[in-house]
Amino acid sequence: LMLTEDGGRVVQPHPQFRMVATGNTVGQGDEYGMYQGARPQSMAMIDRFTIWVNVPYLDKKQRDDLLKSKVPLLKDNQREQLNQYVGEHLEAFTTSKVLQPISPRGMLSLGDTIVNFCTLFNNKDAVNEALEAVILDRCTQQDRAVLKGIVNRIFS
């Protein structure tokens, strides 16, 4: 690092210094409109990162293990249905059928909300209300129609 304000003094990094950055668009912006707010990065910035790794979405077993460990009060059938829903939601996202992704954090939030709503509603209504509150209420009308179709198929 060169500090031009300090007479061009060079600060050497610690030998164990590492930096990791994440990004959904590999710094290229978002030509398909799938990541709102994404902006292209300059090639000078991108050139500073020498190793690029593509990290896929969690697979079904990984999602199941995560739900078991983080939302232990979720009933087995709810967990299985939620896992299936997330898989189909991700498939719809990766094939550009919907613009809204679902992250592991979103999946866990949905699981927690289902558990909490089970104290207020019967099982089916708890799931539907949780899906509305966590996922569907923030969707575009087009995404909502596609995701509601997935919800109706899995949770009916």
Feature locations, PLM:
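C-terminal regulatory/interaction module of P-loop NTP-utilizing enzymes
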Residues: 1-156
